[in-house]
Amino acid sequence: MFDEKDLEQFKKKGTDADKVKAQLELIKNGFPFLELESAASVGNGIVAVDDSQLKVFIKTWDAYCSDGKHSITKFVPASGAASRMFKDLFAFLDADYSVPTTKFEKTFFDGIEKFAFFKDLDAACQSNESKSIKELIADSNYKAVVSNLLGSKGLNYGALPKGLLKFHSYKTSARTPFEEHMAESSMYASGNDGVVNIHFTVSPEHWPLFKKLADSCSKSFSKRFGTTYNITFSEQKPSTDTVAAAADGTPFRNDDGSILFRPGGHGALIENLNELDTDIVFIKNIDNVVPDHLKTDTVTYKKLLAGVLVNIQSKVFDYLHLLDSGKYTAAKLKTISKFVTETLCCRSSDLDKLDSKQLAEWLHGKLNRPIRVCGMVKNVGEPGGGPFLAYNSDGTVSLQILESSQIDLNDERKKEMFTKGTHFNPVDLVCAVRNYKGKHFNLPDYVDKATGFISSKSKNGRELKALELPGLWNGAMSDWNTIFVEVPLSTFNPVKTVNDLLRPQHQPA
């Protein structure tokens, strides 16, 4: 199947023939659907806290930040291109009409002066067309405006990543999501030394642009928020790219005979996450940001999630030290079992069959894992995966964040669980990545390699099958201890299309 050139290509990518064969086998056979016990809901896998508990957890987090013993990092996947944000505007450029016709097009032009990038776009139009946006619209030359927004002769927004686009207007400036993440991180993720660590994963071609922006705004942000920024970057590793298969199941070959590899999706970022030397990691998508006047809820509930995390971690560490000592009673084992099955929602029907030594070993294995606390938002029809109680390969049940592709929607019972789920995943995580002895967990050890999905694509008119790795907060964290906590919808304000920026949540006060 592979010749010497192939093996040389594998070596350069940091992979090998066995891995590639295994990936081709996965593409051929597909992935099994996950067995579900139920959708998670408040009281069944999702914790809802009251105001008094909220205050306690926030105090817990503030104390953790100020004790000077811990490092905190925010991790933001930021490599995605913004092209999908402008899908409707690209379609307008290709349309056989020249004035706004669809609801989307009309909304865009009706609100054009409200976009944070309006001044830049107007300047680009005057430079390239010798006319302002107002004049171009008066001439019904709408497509020139869109071309200057999306194309390389103008702002080039159609080719830039979301993190570098101007999202929000302020009195004397405008901010990108990159800058908004810097601003909000100073409000909940700085230690007692005032340092804010933020790590962005970016694509290689955009790294210099992100670096330039970080260098240009760090000083003013430090002055404004009273913090020092330590901003770092990494790329998705080439070794995490996955092989593409031709229609007959053999490796898809490029015109030059080389084998085609494709990025394996955001699940590959578990490798980048694994390289962070930190105790606690906040994870959030690049486009879920709001202006300063709306950040209160974001900060409050980030602190809540983090407070829950360090509270849980403290108990886990105490239990692990006790189990190591061997000085536990039957009553104490019962207490720890209750914590694992009820608080961590990790259940097994076989526990009654274990003697005390076996039970202690089982509990130790379940407790000594990375921990994540995930915010969950009440379902209001927004897109996103959902929280479930799912069966694992060892027969246990645990909390998982699942996408529709992981669920057999032909099974009416499972389809109902998915469609009638009360909550969805807004990608709002706080993670503890060191064990009770202070050593960093090797995160790839906790990936469920039997998850992922196959998608059909094409290249140069030829069909291919692509392999997506388990998603970062899906299968890549499958074997973590997980707690779901209800957070309000106000903490979830993603920008999926350019017109989302016209929502009140992205407009000035």
Regions found by a protein language model. Give the residues of each.
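Short amphipathic beta-strand starts and helix->beta connectors
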Residues: 182-186, 411-414, 469
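Short, flexible, solvent-exposed loop/turn segments with mixed acidic/basic and small polar residues
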Residues: 36, 185-192, 418-420, 474-475
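C-terminal, active-site-flanking charged/polar segments
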Residues: 281, 391-426, 435, 450-456
